[in-house]
């Protein structure tokens, strides 16, 4: 005769929640929801306040010469152009510095450089702006003159050259200096997370230090480099004071880097124009802020898409 044993308790039963667990879960849910609520509130405010500005003309808005789109297009171009130039300068430098700190520098030197990078990331933007207008612009102006005289046939180096050095390229260099610490700090942490077994396996197979970095470190950190670059691009897109101090803007569309006729950026234009704006002019400036909001949101969304596409090939899994 056999007896049936009572069924064992379901091992997948949920553990009993304590009051503290429920309180913490509710607090975390509330905090996460507030992020979405804040983002939605900002978007709604920008959309509602932008409608009068988008539909405005030169008849009821003194900042416009024709339509809103003719007004905002040079600003959007200047914002993207300056940020792209800054990113082209900052990313190679940041990756190189991060790689040196994480895999080449002695321990003490790496710690010192890491502290310096972290301190540079905390410097206020107005300090970078003052450095750009008082130190960098006068220093690079002779270089601009030489490039225009000897390589003026190249469209980007066409003249006439600016006599003050306050050009779109100078503003881009200041932006590059500002975003370099951010990109460097993130890339450094990504490189340090490379599995040691991957590095040791590459070296055991006879790879040199550079080959190990190229075959193990870079594939692992590729998505992190993209994320860091997009984060730096977001900082460059929204920078205000440094660009407003350095750039001598005239609100045109031009790819020339060294002339005194430079496109402005949306944040700098808002900062310089808003104190004297009134009526529909305020709505026009808010509408330009909406354009910047959309561009920044699109950049972040693109970064997340790129990271998700490359994640399975990064070696992180």
Task: Mark where each language-model region is.
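Periplasmic/extracellular loop-to-transmembrane helix junction in inner-membrane transport proteins
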Residues: 9-27, 46-88, 106, 161, ...
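Membrane-interfacial helix termini and adjacent extracytoplasmic/periplasmic loops
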Residues: 56-73, 128-177, 248, 257-258
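Transmembrane alpha-helical segments of polytopic membrane transport and secretion proteins
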Residues: 1-31, 303-317
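Hydrophobic alpha-helical transmembrane segments of multipass integral membrane proteins
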Residues: 73, 77, 81-89, 93, ...
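Transmembrane-helix boundary motif in ABC transporter permease subunits
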Residues: 86-117, 303-312
